[in-house]
UniProtKB/Swiss-Prot annotation:
Subcellular location: Secreted
The family this protein is said to belong to: Belongs to the 30 kDa lipoprotein family.
Superkingdom, natural source: Eukaryota
Protein name from the UniProt record: Low molecular mass lipoprotein PBMHPC-21
Other information: This lipoprotein belongs to the group of structurally related '30 kDa proteins' that comprise major protein components of the fifth (and last) instar larvae and of pupae.
Family annotation (Pfam families): Lipoprotein_11
Signal peptide boundaries: 1-16
Keywords assigned by UniProt, alphabetized: Lipoprotein, Secreted, Signal
GO cellular component: extracellular region
């Protein structure tokens, strides 16, 4: 969003040189405010970030918030989601709705969403078969795009190390995503399951938004092993599904 300066009629009557100087001065001032807000978020000072955001919005300086949100997403900051969450629960829902991409609002409002793996355009689902531990293997669905099988909901907690954590239960089975405790010795990957309980860090996840081409995408990281992000396996079964959701070590 571009910064727009609105002048009163008496100001418009002055020379063009003075008008340009005033605009440049105000733009410079706003740039300093942007840096202050960005740094507050980056250092995890969310209370200050929320206060600043509410103040700027009340002063008609929403472009500051918009620019900061854009920069956070472009930079792939992990603190973006917690800043959004703090606004959402801190009288700033209108700011989230106005300046954050639409998918942030869906997540914060606790709506059911689809988790789509961009490379293969497959939606995350749980398999129909229960193992002896009453858990289901997670898959990338090769056909389904609109059923309860691929609907997930986020529940937010304020986590450690300034992270927003999520336990996403699926609508169809009401199970949570769980990271396996077993690591493949060759690939260092772990399988993802659906489980009935969410009482350990292996069922807690957080989102890291990023900008890719013209899309806003999210890496999904597990809390227990924070360098691990979700990915789909390479093997495709007869149904067109990818053989389970695995995790890749992100360096």
């Amino acid at each position: 969003m571009k910064f727009v300066v609105v002048f009163a009629s008496c100001v418009l009557a002055v020379s063009a040189g003075v008008t340009e100087m005033s605009a440049a001065s105000m733009s410079s001032s706003n740039k300093e405010l942007e840096e202050k807000l960005y740094n507050s978020i980056l250092t995890g000072d969310y209370d200050s970030a929320v206060r600043q955001s509410l103040e700027y919005e009340n002063q008609g300086k929403g472009s500051i918030i918009q620019n900061v949100v854009n920069n956070l997403i472009i930079d792939g900051s992990r603190n973006t989601m917690e800043y959004c969450y703090k606004l959402w629960v801190g009288n700033g829902q209108h700011i989230v709705r106005k300046y954050f991409p639409y998918n942030f609002r869906l997540i914060m409002a606790g709506n059911f969403v689809k988790l789509i793996y961009r490379n293969y355009n497959l939606a995350l689902k749980l398999g129909p078969t229960l193992d002896p531990a009453n858990e289901r293997l997670a898959y990338g669905d090769g056909k389904e795009k609109n059923s309860d099988l691929i609907s997930w909901k986020s529940h937010y907690l304020v986590g450690e190390q300034h992270s927003v954590l999520q336990d996403p239960p699926t609508l169809s089975y009401n199970q949570y995503l769980k990271l396996s405790s077993t690591t493949d010795c060759n690939t260092q990957d772990r399988i993802i399951f659906g489980t009935n309980t969410a009482d350990t860090t292996r069922e807690q996840w957080f989102l890291q938004p990023t900008k890719y081409e013209n899309d806003v995408l999210f890496f999904i990281y597990n809390r227990e092993v924070q360098r691990v992000a979700l990915k789909l396996g390479r093997i495709v079964d007869a149904s067109g599904d990818r053989s389970g959701i695995w995790t890749r070590w992100m360096k």
